Amino acid sequence: MELYSLTIHELRELLKKREVSALEVTKSYLERIKEVEPKIDALITITEDFALQRAKEADEKIKNGEDTALTGIPVIIKDNISTEGIKTTCSSKMLENYIPPYNATVVEKLLEEGVIILGKSNLDEFAMGSSTENSAFKTTKNPWDLSRVPGGSSGGSAAAIAADEAAFALGSDTGGSIRQPASLCGVVGMKPTYGLVSRYGLVAFASSLDQIGPFTKDVTDCAIVLNTIIGHDPKDSTSLKIDKPDYTSYLKEDIKGLRIGVAKEFFGEGIEEGVKETVQESIKVLQDLGAEIIDISIPYVEYALPAYYIIASAEASSNLARYDGIRYGHIAGKYEDLIDMYMVTRSEGFGKEVKRRIMLGTYALSSGYYDAYYKKALKVRTLIKNDFEKAFEKCDVIIGPTSPTVAFKIGERANDPLAMYLADIYTVSVNIAGLPGISIPCGLSDGLPVGLQIIGRHFDEGKILNVAYAFEQANKFNAKPQAIGGAR
């Protein structure tokens, strides 16, 4: 068994017993990256020298008995999360050479724990997309089938974990950008409750929806990472003050008698038959474990997608106004006056999808259309939140498919934005309501991974992880991607 194929808790066991060193673990991952990265293109930056230096420091910590649950564990960070002294591009020409002078709060927390940063992962430009095809630099391939997308926008992070390029990765989720690629790549991906993890240092897309979360190889690892990255941060005005639980303590609780809601709206038109069948089999697994399955309805969830694209695009058009060519980022080479400089800078710096969303958002916020679009979308948001609250009166968690399809072919939806947007049809409502959700692999359809989404009440990550762990132990999904030469 190669070191790079192990989980966080397996690696920590070896590191604690001093059977391996953090340096050996890091070298194992760096070799793995050299082997598979040319095939999958998951990374924008590889920080080899920094990683080796950090590994030596981690070994010192372990030797002195100062290690924690993540000391010596290698991570990959999505390239829209600020890393001091390491390029943070957002996969955009606009920030192609931008090096942040500070770390995001989540990065700071990981570094304090002795985590080793191996590199930064590819994404859809400014996290806008569902396939990682919108990157200005490269298209990431799915390790299960190199002709298919890994999902998005955190496709680089998901593909990296599926291909064993790191023990875990960080992503951001605005409308499904952690859960959908986790589903398509057959890994665990969690979007925590809005406000639970600091957004300080995350390059903003839609500030009322964005949330940072982990990609891991199993549910136990997800709980371990969550323990470290949550917590109040005065630098983020939306960060919440709550008692920090130990999420690993929830994992082994019995789910007998737990009420699991199955919403009919998550099995409607557009879902692939193979995905539907695999998820229905998963529901049966949970029923056999003693959970009570309850049919529920979330009526307004069918309006979540249009409401999401209006709200997210409106916030993006405001957030991206800061890229003007003056303070940092790309600047036009030739221009006639100040207004021309703004226009040329933004025309050159932003890609097609980012421009599309800025235009959509600006239109929705314009005086003649504000009431008809943006205000209406905010009302729909409230209705969706209310629907979830009513549903949670009848059940403890809600489950369904993460994505209506398995990974689709690269280029297949490139010229059809609507088909691309539909990839997030089951995930956006969770962001709109600010709820926590996880995607865990539950089986294969046509040889490609299917994700099971588990949604909980606000701050009920413990219960979500409990259900996910119980399912994982019973289901024993252990298929591995073969397209890159039999990873894991």
From Swiss-Prot:
Family from the record: Belongs to the amidase family. GatA subfamily.
Active-site annotation: 78 (charge relay system), 153 (charge relay system), 177 (acyl-ester intermediate)
Gene Ontology cellular component terms for the protein in this record: glutamyl-tRNA(Gln) amidotransferase complex
Organism: Thermoanaerobacter pseudethanolicus (strain ATCC 33223 / 39E) (Clostridium thermohydrosulfuricum)
Protein name stated in the entry: Glutamyl-tRNA(Gln) amidotransferase subunit A
Catalytic activity field: L-glutamyl-tRNA(Gln) + L-glutamine + ATP + H2O = L-glutaminyl-tRNA(Gln) + L-glutamate + ADP + phosphate + H(+)
Enzyme Commission numbers on file: 6.3.5.7
Key word Protein biosynthesis present: yes
Pfam families: Amidase
GO biological process: translation
Residues in coiled coil: none
PANTHER family: GLUTAMYL-TRNA(GLN) AMIDOTRANSFERASE SUBUNIT A, TRANSAMIDASE
Nucleotidyltransferase keyword on record: no
Signal peptide: none
PROSITE patterns, A to Z: AMIDASES
Record function comment: Allows the formation of correctly charged Gln-tRNA(Gln) through the transamidation of misacylated Glu-tRNA(Gln) in organisms which lack glutaminyl-tRNA synthetase. The reaction takes place in the presence of glutamine and ATP through an activated gamma-phospho-Glu-tRNA(Gln).
Single annotated GO MF: glutaminyl-tRNA synthase (glutamine-hydrolyzing) activity
Keywords: ATP-binding, Ligase, Nucleotide-binding, Protein biosynthesis
Quaternary structure and interacting proteins, as annotated: Heterotrimer of A, B and C subunits.
NCBIfam families noted in UniProt: gatA
Top-rank taxon, per record: Bacteria
InterPro entries: Amidase, Amidase_CS, Amidase_dom, AS_sf, GatA
